[in-house]
Amino acid sequence: MPVGLVDHFNLVISPSQVDATLRFYCEILGLKEGFRPTFGRPGWWLYAGDHPVLHISLKEIAPTVGPTGSFDHIALNATDWPGMKTTLERHGVAFEEQLVRDNTVLQIFFRDPNGLRVELDYKLKA
């Protein structure tokens, strides 16, 4: 159940901030807009090299209403989902599973004690 490197950050912004946000991360930080799986809602993935390090999602409400402001979640690559599932259940941590069809990844979402959403990504064998 070891956790690996940080995979990406997800930034939640209002629709009015899309242009400025994309311009900032692409023009100033040098990220490149690239492939994003179909999730049924608008958003962008920005890449550093061949890795999507920043995910941008939209919300109509003010992005600072939650306990973490605009910071939506942190995602980490991980291994041994059965072991982690046992650990989460043993500690009474509620979680959600989501299979991303476009790229064979099992995503697990749960919250830390501060309300920050954490995502663990488990790469599935093809």
List the predicted regions and their residue ranges.
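Vicinal oxygen chelate
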Residues: 1-4, 90-126
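N-terminal beta-strand motif that seeds the catalytic metal site of vicinal oxygen chelate
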Residues: 1-22, 72-74, 126
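Conserved N-terminal glycine/acidic-rich loop preference
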Residues: 2-5, 10-12, 44-47, 56, ...
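Core segments of cupin and vicinal oxygen chelate
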Residues: 11-53
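Short beta-strand
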Residues: 35-38, 72, 98-100
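Exposed loop/turn and edge beta-strand positions of beta-sandwich/beta-sheet ligand-binding modules
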Residues: 40, 70, 104
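Mid-chain, well-packed structural core segment of small domains
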Residues: 67-86
